[in-house]
Regions:
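Sequence context surrounding c-type heme c attachment/ligation sites in exported
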Residues: 90, 104-244
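A cross-family structural signal marking well-folded subdomains
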Residues: 2-140, 151
Length: 245
C-alpha cells in the first residue's frame, strides 16, 4: 500500500537515527568521508583548521537534511538560494554572520554559492590539498550529479602534477592531455564542468587569482589580524569553458 509505505518512510526519517543514515549516505555519495584524505598546504591555505573543517561538513549535512525534511525540489542540489553557515564558514565565504551555531542563511541572487558543488566540503574532497583538479571535479559532476560517468583514462597516461610556483596554470597543464587523441574525447566532456568550478580553491574559498609560493604579488589579505606572508597572488583564474551540444 502506497500510503502505508509513505507513512513508514516518514516515521523513519523523523527518528533521530536517520541522521546517521544521512551522514553515511553523504559519505558514500559525495565522498565526504574522504575530507581528511588530503591535507591543505599550510603555506597556501593557512586559514584551514579543524573548526572550518567541521563547519564545512555541517553545512552539507544540514543542507541535505533540510531538503529531506521539507521535501524540497532536487533542483536545489544544483542551485539553491539558501545554505547553512556559522561565523567561521561565513567568513570563509566572504560573508558576515555572528555566532558559532550553524543557521540557515539566504543567499543573494548574485552569490557564487548555491547547491552542492559550491559547498566547501564538496570542493575540498574534489581537490588534492595543494591545487584544484578540473578533471576530478568534472568527473564528480558527470558521475555523482548527472549520472553520466566518463570512461576510464588510458593506462599509459601520466598524472598531472600541480605547479604552486605560479609559472603555469591548471588550464595550461591540462592542455597537454587534451592534445592526446585518446584523451581528447573524454576531456571535451570532463573539462567544461570542472573549469566552471575553478573559481573555488582547494578548500572551497572563492578566488579570482591562484595562490603561489613563488611568483606573484604580495597579498593584501590578513589572517587573524596579521598580514599574510605565506603566499602570493599568482596568475588570474580562467573559469571559462563550453560543453558539447
Amino acid at each position: 500500500d502506497k500510503k502505508v509505505l509513505e507513512n513508514q518512510v516518514n516515521r523513519m526519517l523523523d527518528d533521530k537515527k536517520s541522521n546517521r543514515f544521512i551522514d553515511d549516505f553523504l559519505n558514500q555519495w559525495l565522498g565526504l568521508g574522504e575530507i581528511d584524505a588530503t591535507t591543505p598546504d599550510e603555506k597556501l591555505f593557512p586559514e584551514y583548521d579543524d573548526n572550518l573543517r567541521q563547519a564545512m561538513l555541517s553545512e552539507t549535512r544540514l543542507f541535505f537534511r533540510e531538503l529531506v525534511d521539507k521535501n524540497l525540489s532536487p533542483d536545489n542540489l544544483i542551485d539553491s538560494n539558501f545554505t547553512f553557515l556559522n561565523r567561521r564558514l561565513a567568513e570563509h565565504y566572504g560573508l558576515q554572520l555572528e555566532g558559532e551555531q550553524m543557521v540557515k542563511v539566504s543567499l543573494a541572487g548574485n552569490s557564487p554559492r548555491g547547491g552542492l558543488m559550491t559547498q566547501a566540503s564538496v570542493l575540498k574532497v574534489t581537490s588534492n590539498g595543494v591545487a584544484t583538479s578540473p578533471v576530478k571535479r568534472g568527473n564528480f559532476v558527470l558521475d555523482k550529479l548527472l549520472g553520466t560517468p566518463p570512461s576510464s583514462p588510458p593506462p599509459d597516461i601520466g598524472s598531472i602534477e600541480p605547479d604552486t610556483r605560479g609559472t603555469t596554470t591548471v588550464r595550461e597543464t591540462l592542455a597537454a592531455h587534451r592534445d592526446v587523441e585518446s584523451c581528447a574525447s573524454c576531456h571535451r566532456k570532463i573539462d567544461p564542468p570542472g573549469f566552471a568550478l575553478e573559481s573555488f580553491d582547494p578548500i572551497g574559498g572563492y578566488r579570482t587569482r591562484y595562490r603561489s609560493t613563488g611568483r606573484g604579488e604580495k597579498t593584501k589579505r590578513q589572517l587573524r589580524g596579521r598580514p599574510i606572508r605565506e603566499y602570493r597572488e599568482g596568475p588570474a583564474v580562467d573559469a571559462s569553458g563550453m560543453t558539447e551540444s
